[in-house]
């Protein structure tokens, strides 16, 4: 295959089959690939991920995808870890004994793709169980086109222990002990902390909105939170 309209980036760190099924269920064709040329030529790019930022960035670099992803100009949608990898960096907690000095209690900062100027940090759950796993509501929703037909109070499915704080790039928020960014965006890059592919009809609406998105909509003035 030399081209595809819609692609899912294969970083080796995601349940790609469930994302592919969620897209195809809506009647869209989609290709899973780590081919740089196919990704660059696609009209829409979906960037899912699960697990640790360190492992995912290692895979991205091993596949020579870092510069290609940073250079994309078409709409890109990240899910969960995919959203977190769009930020400047992720703080993944204490270094393990296999990473050097056992007495080093400093946090491990993982440089990410630096597509959206915010950072990911441990979720301030204020005593709530981590990971934050299950259905939760969006507490605020901007007018970003990815949220067409989505309202404050709508439920989405989350699984995460890290989150991006509220910033000028927040386009939706959620609360779990503290308020965090449920979605962020800058230019052509959009990230959702929740899993659209696991969020029933409303999650399907997010995916459909993205795949039907006219890139000119991203250039319109948005009212962020």
UniProtKB/Swiss-Prot annotation:
Record's protein name: Imidazole glycerol phosphate synthase subunit HisH
Please cite one Gene Ontology biological process associated with this protein: L-histidine biosynthetic process
**Pathway annotation from the record:** Amino-acid biosynthesis; L-histidine biosynthesis; L-histidine from 5-phospho-alpha-D-ribose 1-diphosphate: step 5/9
Function of the molecule: IGPS catalyzes the conversion of PRFAR and glutamine to IGP, AICAR and glutamate. The HisH subunit catalyzes the hydrolysis of glutamine to glutamate and ammonia as part of the synthesis of IGP and AICAR. The resulting ammonia molecule is channeled to the active site of HisF.
Does the UniProt entry include the keyword Cytoplasm? yes
Instruction: Report whether Transmembrane shows up as a keyword of the record.
Output: no
Q: Which reaction does it catalyse?
A: 5-[(5-phospho-1-deoxy-D-ribulos-1-ylimino)methylamino]-1-(5-phospho-beta-D-ribosyl)imidazole-4-carboxamide + L-glutamine = D-erythro-1-(imidazol-4-yl)glycerol 3-phosphate + 5-amino-1-(5-phospho-beta-D-ribosyl)imidazole-4-carboxamide + L-glutamate + H(+); L-glutamine + H2O = L-glutamate + NH4(+)
User: Which residues belong to any copy of the Glutamine amidotransferase type-1 domain?
Assistant: 5-220
Question: What HAMAP family does this protein's entry cite?
Answer: HisH
Q: Which InterPro entries match?
A: Class_I_gatase-like, GATASE, Imidazole-glycPsynth_HisH
Keywords (alphabetical) are: Amino-acid biosynthesis, Cytoplasm, Glutamine amidotransferase, Histidine biosynthesis, Hydrolase, Lyase
**What is the organism field in this record?**
Colwellia psychrerythraea (strain 34H / ATCC BAA-681) (Vibrio psychroerythus)
- GO MF terms held by the record: glutaminase activity; imidazoleglycerol-phosphate synthase activity; lyase activity
- Self-association or partners: how does it assemble? Heterodimer of HisH and HisF.
According to the UniProt entry, what is the EC number of this protein? 4.3.2.10, 3.5.1.2
Q: Name one GO cellular component term.
A: cytoplasm
Q: Where in the cell is it found?
A: Cytoplasm
Q: Which gene encodes it?
A: hisH
Q: Where is the active site?
A: 80, 195, 197
């Amino acid at each position: 295959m030399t081209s595809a309209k819609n692609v899912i980036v294969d970083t080796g760190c995601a349940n790609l089959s469930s994302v592919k099924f969620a897209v195809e269920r809506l009647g869209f064709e989609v290709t899973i690939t780590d081919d740089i040329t196919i990704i660059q030529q696609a009209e829409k790019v979906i960037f899912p991920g699960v697990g640790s930022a360190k492992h995912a960035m290692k895979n991205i670099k091993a596949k020579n995808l870092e510069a290609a992803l940073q250079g994309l100009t078409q709409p890109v949608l990240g899910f969960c870890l995919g959203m977190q990898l769009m930020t400047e960096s992720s703080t993944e907690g204490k270094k393990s004994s296999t990473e050097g000095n056992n007495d080093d209690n400093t946090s491990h900062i993982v440089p990410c793709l630096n597509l959206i100027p915010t950072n990911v940090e441990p979720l301030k759950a204020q005593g709530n169980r981590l990971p934050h796993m299950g259905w939760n509501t969006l507490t605020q929703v901007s007018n970003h086109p990815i949220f067409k037909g989505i309202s404050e109070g709508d439920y989405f499915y989350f699984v995460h222990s890290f989150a991006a704080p509220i910033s000028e790039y927040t386009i939706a928020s959620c609360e779990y002990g503290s308020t965090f960014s449920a979605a962020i965006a800058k230019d052509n890059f959009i990230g959702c902390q929740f899993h659209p592919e696991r969020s029933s009809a409303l999650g399907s609406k997010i995916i459909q909105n993205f795949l039907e998105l006219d890139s000119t909509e991203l250039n319109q003035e948005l009212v962020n939170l």
